[in-house]
Amino acid sequence: MSKLRNLNRQLISNIKNHELTTSTKRNLILSILKSTTTKREAKNYLQKYQNQFDFNNSEPSTGKTISDSQRELLVDRFLSGRSLHRSLYDESNQKLEKIPLRLAIFNFKQLSISPRSWKGIRETFMRLLNLGISPVIVLDFDHVRNESFKYNEMYMMNSLNRVMNALEKHEDGNVQTMPLWSIFTTKDNSKTFEVGSLEQILVPLYQGIIPIVMPIAYDTKTTKQTFASAQEITYFLSGALSDLSPGTLSIEKIVFIDPIGGIPSIERNQTSHVFINLSQEYSDIVSELFIGYIEPEQRDLHLQNLNYMNKLLTLTRDKSGSDDATGIITTPHIMSINDDQLNPIIYNVLTDRPIISSSLPSSRDATPQLSTSVLKKGVDVKVLDTSNFSGTFTFDNLVREDCLDKDRMVHLLNDSFGKKLDEEAYFRRINNSLATVVIAGDYDGAAIITWENVAGSDKKVAYLDKFAIAKRNQGLPGLADVIFKVILQSHSGELIWRSQKKNPVNKWYFERSRGSISSLKSPWRVFYTGTIFDKRINKSKHGSSGLDIKRKIHEYIEIGESIPASFT
């Protein structure tokens, strides 16, 4: 009878655990669908992180999960003195599914953060853990004067205790941390650091514990502990983790938490650049910071953040062979926001993009001003126009001089539009009216802009003839924004384009244009933008100053209607 009772209790317990697990999975999936704005984003997130959650297991749990088995394997290896990270899956008795850790490395600057912000930061870490991210914290003490280690040791210890207390001592959930005081070695006070034992980081990570790394190194020559730059520590830690065997982990995010926030932008009135494509924009932004619109001390701090983030993202791309890692620079206050669609770190985990599009016009009142910059190593962007081509600027000449590959351009256009380009007619039409060609990456995307004649006038208007993203990249975060920003910079004064009225992309175009117009009989909608529309609109029939908007719109409609279809 007692055995029957025990079996009954166990059955009830298993059913309750199953209901709780099922409810947790359902709530997680619902929150993901709510926070992502497109089906593609939700799909991309689930494809990357689904192994962290046992989504496919719908039966009541009667034993250890794959994650539990993997965790036990790692801890057993650590206790027996074997390597955790070499041939991890080949040595196990049973073949375990590979579940890589998805890391986010946080560099915390200036620890004078309010208790209220720490509470929000703690909740952000809890959310990240629930979303399958394994955080690693590096505390930054670069503001401490480089005096003797002993002089500042107590200050650093007290700061560490404050951080641990802020993250752990709350009733509404459990965040566990583990301080790592001196895991780096150096020699003769050099700027090169080695991680003594990666197991000290991996074991807590596999147990769901957040390691807190102190920027301290042991000098093997002087046998003394010494300070280290937190950003240098982050760099060498990222390199060591990236060298682990494939499938062990991936560095998804590198986050600088800094009171000064993201990299300032002149275009955005010194609020932050929304998205930085480092391969294309790095040198321009460095030059922009030296123009003199911010104090030198602040400028140097922003330059340091930009330089180190560029180094880190270059390192992770070179080590992994992919551009998956994302950099985020934001403030403690913004990290403490507990809203998936307003917290740029959470939102980026879910969507891999900034909370607003970087190609939205910054002058619009509806465009938020941010203190966060999202950075990617990104793609190279080639811009071809009369300023960098010595001969007659025609499409044929660009092909003849190997400035672009015609076959690859045609393939991109066919792939992007899902139609076959009428090559002969199209290139004959644009050959002598070409204004600008933009090529992103390895023909990942492109734009072709032409000069179109205004009827009854010698004036010309820049017309965005083709804007193409390869199908494989149409969900790639930021690529369309990167190309469109270049288009707008190349023709900032006046630009028009057309799109079929039923095109689902039109919502995106509406947000980036000054206006649009179409006739009832036409299948096309013509969009327009440019600084020309900053002028006062001329409402007088006889006035010569200002912008004659009616005449402009009439010209745009005529151009849009006169251009023949390009695809068969």
Swiss-Prot record:
Residues 393-552 form the N-acetyltransferase domain. Gene3D superfamilies: 3.40.630.30. GO terms for biological process: L-arginine biosynthetic process; ornithine biosynthetic process. Disulfide bonds: none annotated. It is an enzyme of class 2 (transferase). Pathway: Amino-acid biosynthesis; L-arginine biosynthesis; N(2)-acetyl-L-ornithine from L-glutamate: step 1/4. The keyword Hydrolase does not apply. Residues 1-35 form a transit peptide. It comes from the Eukaryota. It is found in: Mitochondrion. It catalyses: L-glutamate + acetyl-CoA = N-acetyl-L-glutamate + CoA + H(+). Its main location: mitochondrion. One of its GO terms (molecular function) is L-glutamate N-acetyltransferase activity. Keywords: Acyltransferase, Amino-acid biosynthesis, Mitochondrion, Transferase, Transit peptide. InterPro entries: GlcNAc_Synth_fun, Vertebrate-like_GNAT_dom. The keyword Amino-acid biosynthesis applies. GO terms for cellular component: mitochondrial matrix. Its EC number is 2.3.1.1. N-acetylglutamate synthase involved in arginine biosynthesis. Belongs to the acetyltransferase family. This is Amino-acid acetyltransferase, mitochondrial. It comes from Meyerozyma guilliermondii (strain ATCC 6260 / CBS 566 / DSM 6381 / JCM 1539 / NBRC 10279 / NRRL Y-324) (Yeast).
